[in-house]
């Protein structure tokens, strides 16, 4: 199976706002090891998160810049962009653009579905871009 193609398809589905289609790529017993504040680390929890995220950033784009595969795992170094147009995690819309880097690691099963996810998202940069956290001094 071409797990890299599945990873790209998952991003494409999110870019199209198709959270249910994205969810179809997840196994029923999917586990997310990346903390989603206030949400269960399950298939339904992840779908809820992306519904909230897309409501807040309706022009969300997730683009894989590099994809590496090894056995049943895929690693994507990606970029998420969008404009904050709705409430997100208690923060009212700011109208500001975000451009954030992230890493996704997915373990796929023999059936081609995603069973586990580990991720790192540059939340600090996003909060600085939204004006919720002051930017630090230049490096």
PLM-predicted stretches and their roles:
Residues 1-139:
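C-terminal and inter-domain tail/linker signature
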């Amino acid at each position: 199976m071409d797990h890299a193609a599945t990873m790209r398809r998952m991003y494409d589905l999110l870019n199209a706002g198709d959270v249910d289609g994205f969810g179809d790529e997840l196994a029923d017993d999917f586990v997310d090891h990346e903390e989603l504040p206030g949400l269960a680390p399950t298939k339904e929890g992840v779908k809820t998160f992306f519904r909230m995220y897309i409501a807040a950033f309706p022009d969300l784009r997730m683009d894989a810049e590099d994809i590496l595969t090894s056995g049943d795992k895929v690693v994507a170094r990606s970029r998420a962009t969008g404009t904050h147009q709705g409430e997100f995690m208690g923060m009212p819309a700011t109208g500001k653009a975000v451009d954030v880097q992230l890493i996704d690691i997915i373990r796929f099963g023999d059936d081609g579905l995603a069973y586990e996810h580990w991720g790192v998202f540059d939340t600090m940069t996003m909060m600085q871009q939204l004006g919720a956290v002051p930017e630090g001094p230049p490096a």
